[in-house]
Amino acid sequence: MTEFDLNQYMDRVGRQARAASRAIARASTADKNRALLTIAAAIRRDADQLKAVNARDVERARANGQDAAFVDRLTLSDKAIATMAAGLEQIAALPDPIGEISNMKFRPTGIQVGQMRVPLGVIGIIYESRPNVTIDAAALCLKSGNATILRGGSEAIESNTALAALVAEGLSAAGLPPEAVQVIETTDRAAVGRLITMTEFVDVIVPRGGKSLIARLMEEARVPMIKHLDGICHVYIDAEADLDKAVRVCDNAKTQRYAPCNTMETLLVSQDIAAAALPPLCRIYQQKGVELRVCPATRATLEAAGFSGLVDASEEDWRLEYLAPILAIKTVVGLDQAISHINEYGSHHTDSIITENYSAGMRFIREVDSASVMINASTRFADGFEYGLGAEIGISNDKLHARGPVGLEGLTSLKYVVFGHGEVRT
């Protein structure tokens, strides 16, 4: 596809999305739910065909030398297909935020002022190898009254196109424009460059991908972004922590799963409790095969307790998202240093304190500058489902617009509504 043809194609997609966004914005909850449930039924009906199409993507990925983890993310198994269908049904069951009016106030002039929740408009979503994101993103955008343009990874092009056809079927069955959800059908990388600069058609970009993708988009995008960067999550064991809670929470925060962005990557421990807290916890980590990268004070504490096989932490380790069985551990003087370390080295994602001291806990959640801050709970709870939001499009580290898990409300905005009785301003 020439540059001229690509620009024409992307402009057509953008115009269609903008036109469809107006219809989706005024669609009834019943029609949106009907579309979601029809898509779910179509996915179950065509499961075998979806697996056959996906198998071609998987075969191509293997031939291109992609590793096992990549192939696993790409594969549409029976479980993955069932999960997609169930997810659509769950989103259909969620309350519709669109049109909700809140914060109504009577003014001395006689008018009433409130805020109404409305769609953002057209959302561009850029993602990599997971074809299930096609359905998750389409469903969240549809329920929140937005049109969406989806740009998945080239490795999943056949799977994404097949899923998009089922989405179009569901939209049409509910009397909604099929152009409300469009998958970019070219694998040309220049399509991403055009999508992120189409300010006339696209209201916001939501990228889901690795560091290099996000970095490129931050440099080149003209459309505003809701982005998800690293998940460098911390747990701080305070001097007044309950040791049983500390061991249980810190074990779960690191070892329940290694790949999610809400997994703990750095453990901070008060020097006043390090000798009691570190040995039982690190014994569990070593039994589970977790590599421990430690500061000098932590090394001294653990070696005195008979530990070996420790790795010296470098300055870089405090800034790394491992997504692997590796944990950085630092012994700190106390709460002041813990908060300072998190705000300097963290990614503003999710951080937790283990303490029985109310004042310490409240100070931690006030002063740590992260999207989610916790007291006596695992960072693994930083999730839209666990927060009662239902499905999520991602977890935003940003401070503007959506922050933390981005569910239906995160894909909307508020406009002011005023009710009067003929009042005029004097």
From Swiss-Prot:
The keyword Amino-acid biosynthesis applies. Its EC number is 1.2.1.41. GO terms for cellular component: cytoplasm. InterPro entries: Ald_DH/histidinol_DH (IPR016161), Ald_DH_C (IPR016163), Ald_DH_N (IPR016162), Aldehyde_DH_dom (IPR015590), G-glutamylP_reductase_CS (IPR020593), Glu-5-SA_DH (IPR012134), GPR_dom (IPR000965). It catalyses: L-glutamate 5-semialdehyde + phosphate + NADP(+) = L-glutamyl 5-phosphate + NADPH + H(+). It comes from the Bacteria. It is an enzyme of class 1 (oxidoreductase). Catalyzes the NADPH-dependent reduction of L-glutamate 5-phosphate into L-glutamate 5-semialdehyde and phosphate. The product spontaneously undergoes cyclization to form 1-pyrroline-5-carboxylate. PANTHER family: DELTA-1-PYRROLINE-5-CARBOXYLATE SYNTHASE, GLUTAMATE SEMIALDEHYDE DEHYDROGENASE. This is Gamma-glutamyl phosphate reductase. The lineage of its organism: Bacteria, Pseudomonadati, Pseudomonadota, Betaproteobacteria, Burkholderiales.
